[in-house]
Amino acid sequence: MHISPMPNRKTDINNNGGFSTDMIGMNHSYPEASYRERQQIFDAHLSYTLGLLYFIGHDARVPEKMRNEMLRWGLPKDEYTDNGHWTPQLYIRESRRMVGEYVATQADCENRTTVDDGVGMAAYTMDSHNCQRIVIHKDGKAMVKNEGDVQIGIGSPYPVSYRSITPKREECTNLLVPVCLSASHIAYGSIRMEPVFMVLGQSAAKAACLAIDGGTDVQQVDVRQIQRMYDEDPLLDDTAPDIMVDDTAVEPAAGSQWQRVNIYGGYGPSLYKLEPSGRSE
């Protein structure tokens, strides 16, 4: 397990390794399941997770040092007090997604494809936990392998297309989808961060207002008006926007010797550059 310390002597525990807190493959039917079936899936995951923690702390086959360390911990006494100190919901990272006007893919994450109608930026690693366990037969022997784990970094932040949050026009003209947006499995593993959802939600709200005020379909909204909102008031708090000088600012760069500073300092297809002195004037 990957254990990250948090305030008040709490931890954020995540899956780590080939056999851990992920109940691999047992969640596949959740999106299409009834409420009763979803509860059964939840109960199975609860039993698996609590059983794993109990096993580590009590089973004689586990090294004593590890058992003693596990027994130092317990469920948070001040959280979910009406549910046995356990969350009543599963963490749903990815589920059904819309197939919209544009499907974001790995090429977008790697800036091999650049869109001009971006209404938000994403920057997280292309990330997926294992999706299934499969049996491999080789040389007369069988072994179980996990399949689906992906941890691939990206070069720089990339724009998320407005068309990825709008459905195909022939299917619907008054729907905006900032979370279950149109993206491949790999691209969604990068886009799916809460700050990105917040920005896409704000963009969707702005688009809804523009569509209503203009009496148009959401596909006909002038995306430049959404982009202008972020250019003029990026924090949406009426403060002045930052002044960004990079390799697209031709006049400031003229006559100066600029260099790439950090590939992670980029914004879309543009990468920040500074003079050797470090000055950004």
Where are these regions (language model features)?
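Glycan-recognition and processing domains
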Residues: 240-280
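Flavin (FAD/FMN)-binding glycine-rich loop and adjacent Rossmann-like elements that form
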Residues: 1-236, 240
